[in-house]
Amino acid sequence: MTQDMLLGNEEPSKSKETFLEKFCVLAKSSTGAALLDVIRQALEAPNVFVFGELLAEPSVLQLKDGPDSKHFETLNLFAYGTYKEYRAQPEKFIELTPAMQKKLQHLTIVSLAIKAKSIPYALLLSELEIDNVRHLEDIIIEAIYADIIHGKLFQNTRILEVDYAQGRDIPPGYTGQIVETLQAWVNSCDSVSNCIEMQIKYANAEKSKRLINKERVEQDLINLKKVLKSQTSDSDESMQIDTHGPGTSGGLGQSELRKKPSKLRNPRSAAVGLKFSK
């Protein structure tokens, strides 16, 4: 046997309720010893692991308060109970055959697997009242081959990891608890949904603020560029005025400087041509 054993099919097989149908049909037309025999056959049948429909048969319900109430209580035990409950009060039930005891142990494993997906060997040994690990592993493997659980045995850590567990019968009155549990789950979902909606509204509001800020910053940049462009244009015009200004304020321009010297080219000759009169 390897240290880790992966067991079970990938998908659960056909519902075990179909195997119970023939016993329900027999119970409808049986009374007395014949009915008790039908119940014992159902308890020993290798493919029957649910008993709710058989318990609901009128002929079976009549056994509850009669001299054969142990058969009813035993059927009730297999539908909802565990092996430890049987061991605690064996006088309440009919004497179980080895096949019946093993089936009740298998059903006990199913009950544990429904509550937790990781089950220590120590808990299984206690619930099944087994003191031998090899015997325990054999019981688990038989339950897996019966297709009521799928899982993996970790022998080093002594843990059964459950991947799938068949459901058991729902006890009378338990439906109300299921409704309450589902309602609590719905309320929790509503609360989470409201919280998510609030977060979405907050995120949208923050997004709107960021868009507004982005538009404002972009507009500020556009305005700043306009101001800078205007200042640059004014500076260029001022520089042009400073460059041409002296020629228009009474000073001599370059063209004038070139022309004026020609009038004073020979001052002496100009003086000779002057006539004086007395």
UniProtKB/Swiss-Prot annotation:
InterPro entries: COPS7/eIF3m, CSN7_helixI, PCI_dom
Keywords of this entry: Cytoplasm, Developmental protein, Differentiation, Nucleus, Oogenesis, Phosphoprotein, Signalosome
Region (Disordered): 233-278
Assigned protein family: Belongs to the CSN7/EIF3M family. CSN7 subfamily.
Role: Component of the COP9 signalosome complex (CSN), a complex involved in various cellular and developmental processes. The CSN complex is an essential regulator of the ubiquitin (Ubl) conjugation pathway by mediating the deneddylation of the cullin subunits of the SCF-type E3 ligase complexes, leading to decrease the Ubl ligase activity of SCF. The CSN complex plays an essential role in oogenesis and embryogenesis and is required for proper photoreceptor R cell differentiation and promote lamina glial cell migration or axon targeting.
Subunit structure: Component of the CSN complex, probably composed of CSN1b, alien/CSN2, CSN3, CSN4, CSN5, CSN6, CSN7 and CSN8. In the complex, it probably interacts directly with CSN2 and CSN4.
Protein's UniProt name: COP9 signalosome complex subunit 7
Gene (name only): CSN7
